[in-house]
């Protein structure tokens, strides 16, 4: 019997942005390509999301409410996320 779709999901250890903030990534691989999704958490509460779609080669980051993160946390988030996505795509 032929499978309709093949899907594999992998969860990663949190990426530390600051003492109170991290990103929890999950990678999903399907026949149509790879999707990477991350929840941005501060003090255990979701304050944003990151998603990357290999099919369209785009990344979307949303932080809401923006005022929940410090300028340093936002800078660190944008400094680390592209490297994390690249590593996940090439493993």
Language-model segment annotations:
Residues 1-91:
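Viral virion structural and adsorption modules
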């Amino acid at each position: 019997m032929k499978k309709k779709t093949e899907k594999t999901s992998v969860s990663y250890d949190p990426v530390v942005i600051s003492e109170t903030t991290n990103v929890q990534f999950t990678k999903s691989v399907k026949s149509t390509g790879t999707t990477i999704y991350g929840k941005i958490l501060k003090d255990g509460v979701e304050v944003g999301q990151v998603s990357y779609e290999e099919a369209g080669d785009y990344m979307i980051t949303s932080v809401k409410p923006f005022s929940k993160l410090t300028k340093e946390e936002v800078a660190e988030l944008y400094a680390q996320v592209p490297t994390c996505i690249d590593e996940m795509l090439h493993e």
